[in-house]
Amino acid sequence: MKDYNIENNNVEEENPNVETQVVDNEEIVRLKAEIEELKDKLIRTTAEIDNTRKRLEKARDEAKDYAIATFAKELLNVSDNLARALAHKPANSDVEVTNIISGVQMTKDELDKIFHKHHIEEIKPAIGSMFDYNLHNAISHIEHPDHEPNSIITLMQSGYKIRDRLLRPAAVQVVKKP
């Protein structure tokens, strides 16, 4: 009988091992699924972080490019006034007036260089070109037999843009249909 008990003891001991192996296999499958889920979350989180970084870099670059926009808008009137002064210079003038005009011209040229350096472009549509509501502001409409409808007949004030952003539209007079 002792032998029989020993065999039973062995059998009883083997059963927990089988259950442990089954439980271990189920646990392995569950853990593998959890690992896959965590890998997926890691990939998604990494992609989200990368996208956030790219958005922040783009926002930083735009902020750098357009930070001077408000200041530039205020300088546009200065540029306009310098251009008006140069447009009305007298034909014949003495040395002092010529020197003043030369100084105004140098100031205007320097301001234009600064505008160019900061990607500020003048919008100066040609007479006869078509009106573009993205770049122009129609101050008035007149009939004119020699020009197409919706074409620009008079430039009243230059416009400006910084890169692709409009600072001020060009003020124009537009031909209307007769």
Swiss-Prot record:
What keyword terms does UniProt attach to this protein?
Chaperone, Cytoplasm, Stress response
GO process annotations (BP): protein folding; protein import into mitochondrial matrix
PROSITE patterns linked: GRPE
Please provide one cellular component term from the Gene Ontology annotations of this protein: cytoplasm
Gene Ontology MF term list: adenyl-nucleotide exchange factor activity; protein homodimerization activity; protein-folding chaperone binding; unfolded protein binding
Gene3D superfamilies (UniProt xref) = 3.90.20.20, Head domain of nucleotide exchange factor GrpE (2.30.22.10)
Superkingdom, taxonomy of origin: Bacteria
Compartments, record wording = Cytoplasm
- How does this chain assemble? Homodimer.
Role played: Participates actively in the response to hyperosmotic and heat shock by preventing the aggregation of stress-denatured proteins, in association with DnaK and GrpE. It is the nucleotide exchange factor for DnaK and may function as a thermosensor. Unfolded proteins bind initially to DnaJ; upon interaction with the DnaJ-bound protein, DnaK hydrolyzes its bound ATP, resulting in the formation of a stable complex. GrpE releases ADP from DnaK; ATP binding to DnaK triggers the release of the substrate protein, thus completing the reaction cycle.
Protein family membership: Belongs to the GrpE family.
What's the protein called, per UniProt? Answer: Protein GrpE
Q: What is the lineage of its organism?
A: Bacteria, Pseudomonadati, Pseudomonadota, Alphaproteobacteria, Rickettsiales
Q: Which gene encodes it?
A: grpE
